[in-house]
Amino acid sequence: MDARQMKIEAARAALAYVESGMRLGVGTGSTAEEFVRLLAEKVAAGLVIEGVPTSERTARLCVDLGVPLKSLDELPELDLTIDGADEVDGALRLIKGGGGALLREKIVAASSQRMIVIADESKVVQTLGAFALPIEVNPFGLVSTRIQIEKTAARLGLSGALNLRQSEDGNFMTDGGHFIIDASFGRIPDAEALSIALNSIPGVVEHGLFINMATLAIIAGPSGARTLQANNT
């Protein structure tokens, strides 16, 4: 089973949690896109849901495949969000944002009664931080914000490269018009403390640490999919 097949397996297992009539947050990224494709097949077969996308890219895919959508303002309270992750630890703390949609992903997840994470087994870690932490920042005062991120990290014993994410057209820009700094801190022993500290920086719009948000993870490996509960690796 290759990496894509594992993503499909995790996405397929997540469909078992989707019930007709649900208001569903729909994630962003390669694994979430596999879920959208499978969801579209269920919708075509009669499943009734209303989806809220976490990015313009996800919205376009849903429209192309016939998945009905509403805005979060139209459906401000959701039953379930299904999304991928770049890393997940044993407490279901996540690093997200590799796809550049972390702000909307976090807003949608926070509006949901439950959040299920789908991923292949390579995303499961003992301690977060091998994947660079995406930090969404306001373009105004970018240099100042970067310095404050460095100082804040240093107070927590963290250091590493802070790279402004690039696209083919220059600086990568989120759907909300912000930049992303990818912070290669390495091992993050206290994700909660870093989350609070980053949120205190005025130029930081949001960061990719998702703490106490996921209620279940579905992890796929060569032998199939398994569920991961908090502190049960």
UniProtKB/Swiss-Prot annotation:
SUPFAM superfamilies the record matches: D-ribose-5-phosphate isomerase (RpiA), lid domain, NagB/RpiA/CoA transferase-like
Keywords: Isomerase
Pathway involvement of the protein, from the record: Carbohydrate degradation; pentose phosphate pathway; D-ribose 5-phosphate from D-ribulose 5-phosphate (non-oxidative stage): step 1/1
Disulfide bonds: none
Subunit structure comment from the entry: Homodimer.
Gene, per the UniProt record: rpiA
Taxonomic lineage: Bacteria, Pseudomonadati, Pseudomonadota, Alphaproteobacteria, Hyphomicrobiales
Domain of life of the native organism: Bacteria
Organism whose genome encodes this protein: Rhizobium rhizogenes (strain K84 / ATCC BAA-868)
Catalytic residue list: E105
Protein name as it appears in the record: Ribose-5-phosphate isomerase A
UniProt function note: Catalyzes the reversible conversion of ribose-5-phosphate to ribulose 5-phosphate.
Family, as annotated: Belongs to the ribose 5-phosphate isomerase family.
Reactions catalysed, as given in the entry: aldehydo-D-ribose 5-phosphate = D-ribulose 5-phosphate
CDD domains for the chain: RPI_A (cd01398)
E.C. number: 5.3.1.6
Top EC class for this record: isomerase
Alphabetized NCBIfam families for the sequence: PRK00702.1, rpiA
Annotated substrate binding sites: T28, G29, S30, T31, D83, G84, A85, D86, K96, G97, G98, G99, K123
InterPro entries noted in UniProt: NagB/RpiA_transferase-like, Ribose-5P_isomerase, Ribose5P_isomerase_typA_subgr, Ribose5P_isomerase_type_A
Annotated GO biological process: pentose-phosphate shunt, non-oxidative branch
GO molecular function terms noted in the UniProt entry: ribose-5-phosphate isomerase activity
